[in-house]
A protein has these predicted regions:
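Predominantly transmembrane beta-strands of Gram-negative outer membrane beta-barrel pores used
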Residues: 30, 38-60, 64, 76-82, ...
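Residues embedded in well-ordered regular secondary structure
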Residues: 1-66, 104-106, 141-149, 162-164, ...
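Glycine-rich, aromatic-lined ligand/substrate-binding cores of catalytic
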Residues: 569-602
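Extracytoplasmic gating/loop element in the C-terminal half of outer-membrane beta-barrel translocons
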Residues: 13-17, 265, 306, 542-544, ...
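Exposed, low-structure sequence patches enriched in small/polar residues
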Residues: 286-290, 300, 344, 473, ...
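Conserved small-residue
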Residues: 1-19, 246, 442, 459-568, ...
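Intrinsically disordered, low-complexity polar segments
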Residues: 54, 113-114
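Extracellular/periplasmic, surface-exposed regions of secreted and cell-surface proteins
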Residues: 37, 72, 78-87, 92-97, ...
Length: 717
């Protein structure tokens, strides 16, 4: 064992603890069983003209990582009053207070930590370096020495009034307002390695405010009992503002005992402010027409404005046309008893996207320091270029759908086929270095999307005491880059002669015309070089146990000519199966099963490169190649992954039991004796299990996703 410990470069403390049988389970110290508590109480009722609802709620969550906590209290008031027969007014208001002073344990350090260290010093204080060397710090250190304060408050309110006017007209005005406040304070103690002497602190104070107003005029009339017209006109306006002040300081003197409360005690203070504002407005006209409730037509036009776009194009106009045909109402299907509903839908329409920074189209100034004659002056310089022509991104789509209900609606569902084209994508385009600017917000390219969606719902059993229904959904999508920046390059033949031109790809971002926006173009890992292949491996600078890449053209070298299209990073197929079973009108069991298929991502664990292994540090367990274990997937320890760099792509396909729920509702005859109107107990589990070959994390989130059990009691008096 002494030789073994020397090879692993054990420190004296590790040798001592190993010989004494002292072992630290760091994962057990940083992970815990999470607990989520959610309580709510509400009162509702109505009078002859008024409906009201009042509720209070409290949430207390502790996550699976030690120190991960969240607290929130909520209150809500809803009122609706009929002032007269032609006027209704209402109010919906909510206030939420959230707190999270959580300082989480360092799970990354815990994963890498040697089990033969000490958590605490002899006097019971936290030990900064559990192994008395410069490896990772104690995973619990930040929880012991840092300080945090985080609070948010949000107030939302919506006030509305509705007028019923003559001739089928109604008018409704809704005013929405939201206020938000946030305090985010943190102190980093200098007890932690790498923190400046005295420690450092940050205080962020943030508030925001937004309002919107919606005015809607509606008209609905039916003529000759078969012609129905429904007209809607909407005018909207909105405004958003925020204010943020940030103070930082470090090198607290004489020490950091006052934490962020005494931020003025540091020796290098910095302050900054960031205030933002945006506005928008819009107009919408929509007309729905139906003939005998069998032939349906819809047309709409909307004009939206947004302050973040260039001065030349702040507005976008988007139109939609749709038609529907209830075929099941036709005479030739009236006698087909097993068809209850059959509707054909066809639509064409445009939508706009304004997802850009509030000042993306404007030239912005950045504050800088200028030193002249030894004196520090503040100055500003233009850090971005304006684009006066920046405009809305527009998606034009065509949709064909069928809705159906069969066998007394025991089987129902829909089928959707769609084809979309997005133009003028909002993107940052790289600028030439000579310009002095890195990028400029632009409208670029064209992206095509097409796919299908299927929904099937069935009532499998429907008796007096048993009802069982299921719903299955499936969707598939494919996208393709049709056009990028319009930069043309020459196309050469094998002899280097120009035979034409084509639009250039964006290799830096991995965007290639004719391919999906997230399609992977890279080398193909085909395993590991084996014994007996030394001479062949040497041609590529490798040896047995090193990763082996596919030499597509067999020229004895690996370069860009050997890259292949390997797959996409988004699923090609998504499926969901949900089931709901009710027994004797009191027992209910349901589940949701979800799966995503046809996608892949980087999983480089099989590379086993040198920097993953340092003395007794831990890592995710993997197999590795040796002459005695000549597996074809996992490389040797310290494998050569350079020239060129190697990425390994694994499928992220999975099937997940998303949710399972079981509940029992007590019979009213039993509980009414105790003046209880409804009593229900429930148990619920999220993320019950996952089936996947993806090893390193949750295949959907690429992180650790907890399994959550929820026990609930619902009481109505």
């Amino acid at each position: 064992s002494e030789t073994w410990m020397q090879r692993l470069e054990f420190n004296p403390i590790e040798v001592t603890n190993y010989k004494a049988g002292k072992f630290v389970d760091w994962m057990d110290l940083v992970y815990q069983n999470g607990l989520r508590q959610d309580y709510s109480a509400s009162v509702s009722g109505k009078t002859a003209r008024t409906n009201y609802y009042v509720s209070l709620g409290y949430t207390n969550n502790d996550g699976i990582v030690v120190g991960d906590q969240f607290r929130a209290s909520r209150s809500r008031v809803n009122l609706d009053t009929e002032i007269t027969k032609w006027l209704n007014i209402g109010l919906n208001a909510q206030f939420v207070h959230k707190g999270s002073d959580d300082i989480k344990a360092d799970t990354g350090a815990a994963k890498a930590a040697s089990p033969f260290g000490d958590v605490y010093e002899a006097d019971g204080s936290i030990k900064v370096r559990p192994w008395d060397d410069n490896r990772v710090a104690n995973p619990l250190l930040n929880r012991s020495v840092d300080d945090k304060y985080y609070r948010t408050q949000t107030f939302n309110s919506s006030v509305y009034g509705k007028l019923t006017l003559p001739f089928g007209f109604t008018w409704q005005t809704t005013f929405n307002v939201r206020y938000g406040w946030r305090k985010d304070y943190y102190f980093d103690s200098d007890i932690k390695p790498g923190v400046v002497a005295g420690g450092k602190a940050k205080r962020v104070d943030y508030s925001d405010y937004e309002w919107s107003i919606d005015n809607m005029l509606k008209w609905n009339r039916t003529f000759a009992k078969i012609h129905n017209f429904d007209f809607t006109f909407v005018y909207t306006a909105e405004k958003y503002q925020n204010w943020q002040s940030t103070g930082n300081n470090e090198g607290f003197q004489p020490n950091g005992a006052l934490s962020y409360h005494g931020i003025q005690a540091g020796i290098t203070p910095t302050v900054s402010a960031n205030d933002e504002m945006q506005t928008g407005n819009g107009l919408l006209w929509r007309l729905n027409y139906s003939l005998m409730d069998r032939y349906l037509l819809t047309g709409s036009v909307r004009r939206d404005g947004f302050s973040a776009f260039g001065q030349n194009n702040p507005f976008g106009v988007f139109s939609t046309v749709a038609a529907g045909w209830r075929m099941s109402e036709e005479k030739f299907l009236k006698d087909v008893k097993w068809i209850n509903n059959l509707k054909l839908r066809l639509s064409w329409g445009q939508t706009g996207n304004r997802d850009i920074g509030r000042y993306a189209a404007f030239s912005r100034l950045t504050i800088t320091n200028v030193i002249q004659n030894g004196v520090n002056y503040k100055g500003v310089y233009p850090s971005s270029l304006a684009n006066r022509d920046l405009k809305w991104e527009t998606t034009t789509g065509f949709n064909l759908g069928v809705d159906f209900g069969l066998f007394n609606n025991r089987l129902s569902g829909s089928v959707e086929l769609y084809k979309n084209k997005t133009n003028d994508l909002l993107m940052d385009r790289a600028m030439p270095e000579i310009s002095g600017y890195g990028k400029i917000a632009s409208n670029l390219g064209e992206l095509a999307n097409q796919g299908a969606e299927l929904t099937l719902s069935s009532v499998n059993v429907n008796t007096r005491n048993v009802r069982w229904g299921t719903t299955f959904t499936y969707s598939t999508n494919k996208n393709e880059i049709k056009h990028l920046y319009g930069d043309m390059i020459d196309v050469l033949d094998a002899e280097g002669n120009v035979i034409g031109q084509r639009e250039d790809d964006d290799v830096q971002n991995g965007w290639y015309i004719g391919h999906a926006i997230d399609e992977i173009y890279d080398y193909k890992w085909i395993g590991v070089w084996q014994l007996g292949e030394e001479l062949e491996a040497a041609k590529y600078g490798k040896q047995p146990g090193d990763p082996r890449l596919l030499d597509v053209n067999n020229d004895g070298k690996i370069n860009d000519d050997d890259k292949l299209w390997l797959g996409t990073k988004t699923p090609k197929h998504r499926m969901t199966l949900s089931s709901d079973l009710n027994l004797f009108k009191c027992i209910n069991f349901s589940f949701v099963l979800r799966g995503e298929f046809g996608w892949m991502d980087i999983d480089n664990l099989p590379r086993n490169e040198t920097n993953r292994f340092y003395n007794t540090s831990n890592s995710v367990w993997t197999e590795y190649w040796t002459p005695w274990n000549p597996n074809s997937k996992y490389a040797r320890l310290g494998a050569n992954i350079d020239s060129p760099g190697v990425n390994i792509y694994e499928k992220r396909n999975y099937v997940r039991m998303q949710n399972m729920a079981l509940s029992y509702t007590f019979p009213k005859k039993l509980i009414n004796k105790f003046m209880i109107d409804n009593l229900r107990f429930s148990i619920n589990v999220d993320n019950a299990f996952v089936i996947s070959k993806w090893r390193t994390s949750d295949p959907l989130t690429k992180a650790i996703t907890p399994r959550i059990w929820t026990f609930g009691v619902d009481i109505t008096l």
